[in-house]
């Protein structure tokens, strides 16, 4: 499965770790869309501090987006990927809106003779949907998390990286450097550009398992974490056949940029392309991190093998 690093924590104790390929104990590894879930934890910390309200409109914080698809959307819509837009998350796109997005974020080079005005200018141009309304669809769209990152920088009056370090990494006891990719103008790609060490991501997962607490202090409000785990109506989620999530977790849901699996142990997880996983099983008191370098963005066969592996590990430790 092209695994670079793998670790298991059970009841707060590291019981297994393994490295190969690009993995090393002291080397940050890109976590791709797990970055989204990390951003949601930071958003929760800011909600707890009273600087962010998830029911406020996106444009209350970012009036720059008033002409975009984000007009009329709330922060909660961002968090649950229930924004109606004309964006398509298509990794095969070589010259359309998804490629324009990647170029704006400085993840792909600008074509010869071309130019980009950066990620945030791209977000101001996000096309509206002609067929749906906010809150009526689950539409996995990476740029929505970049908007959340912009909101976080606006309300915190500091960079996303500094705030994540101050409010999440340090309180969890992280011991290695982390970083996040930036566009040409310094905007972070909060949708997928974070790189963290294996053990530090494991500690964040353990904080989530412990309802937001780490090292004797509240890092993220317990109410925020409980809401991520809470079972709720999932008809919007089940009505979609785009993205991979609904196919893996038919009875699951998506809350605050985390996947609810709908499995018997009420596991939640964060997933990144090319094989990144953060798996939390509250019933088995289990946290698992897998970092990898899959050849393809999404590999359903390997994903299902990993789900079976996570279940087997939980059964073996219970």
Q: What does each model-identified segment do?
A:
Residues 81, 144-151, 192-213, 276-292:
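Active-site-proximal alpha-helical segments within enzyme catalytic domains
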Residues 25-26, 90-93, 101-185, 189-192:
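Catalytic-site signature segments of enzymes, centered on catalytic residues
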Residues 267-318:
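Structured C-terminal helix/loop/strand segments within mature extracytoplasmic catalytic/sensor domains
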Residues 12, 30-54, 78, 148-152, ...:
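Active-site SXXK
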Residues 175-179, 226-287:
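Active-site Gly/Thr loop motif
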Residues 30, 48-90, 155-192, 196:
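Active-site helix/loop module of the DD-peptidase/beta-lactamase fold
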Residues 1-3, 27, 273-274:
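Short, small/polar residue-rich loop motifs at catalytic or cofactor-binding pockets
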Residues 1-23, 285-289:
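A short, well-structured edge-of-sheet supersecondary motif
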């Amino acid at each position: 499965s092209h695994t670079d690093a793998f670790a298991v924590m059970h009841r707060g104790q590291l019981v297994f770790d393994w490295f190969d390929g690009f993995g090393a104990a002291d080397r940050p590894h890109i976590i791709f869309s797990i970055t989204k879930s990390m951003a949601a934890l930071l958003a929760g910390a800011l909600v707890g501090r009273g600087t962010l309200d998830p029911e406020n409109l996106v444009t209350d914080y970012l009036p720059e987006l008033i002409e975009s698809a984000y007009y009329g959307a709330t922060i909660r819509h961002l968090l649950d990927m229930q924004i109606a837009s004309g964006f398509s998350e298509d990794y095969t796109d070589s010259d359309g809106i998804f490629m324009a997005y990647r170029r704006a974020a400085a993840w792909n080079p600008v074509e010869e003779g071309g130019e980009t005005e950066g990620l945030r200018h791209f977000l101001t141009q996000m096309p509206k949907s002609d067929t749906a309304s906010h809150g009526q669809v689950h539409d996995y769209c990476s740029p929505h998390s970049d908007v959340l990152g912009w909101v976080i920088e606006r309300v915190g009056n500091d960079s996303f990286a500094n705030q994540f370090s101050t409010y999440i990494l340090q309180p969890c006891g992280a011991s290695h450097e982390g970083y996040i990719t930036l566009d040409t103008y310094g905007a972070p790609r909060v949708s997928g550009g974070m790189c963290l060490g294996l053990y530090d991501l494991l500690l964040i997962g353990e904080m989530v398992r412990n309802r937001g607490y780490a090292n004797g202090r509240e890092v993220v409000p317990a109410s925020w974490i409980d809401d991520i785990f809470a079972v709720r109506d999932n008809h919007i989620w089940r009505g979609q056949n785009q993205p991979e999530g609904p196919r893996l977790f038919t009875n699951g849901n998506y809350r605050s940029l985390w996947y609810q699996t709908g499995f018997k142990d009420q596991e939640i997880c964060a997933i990144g392309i090319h094989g990144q996983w953060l798996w939390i099983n509250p019933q088995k008191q289990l946290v698992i991190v897998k970092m990898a370098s899959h050849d393809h963005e999404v590999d359903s066969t390997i994903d299902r093998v990993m789900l079976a592996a996570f279940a087997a590990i939980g059964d073996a430790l219970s």
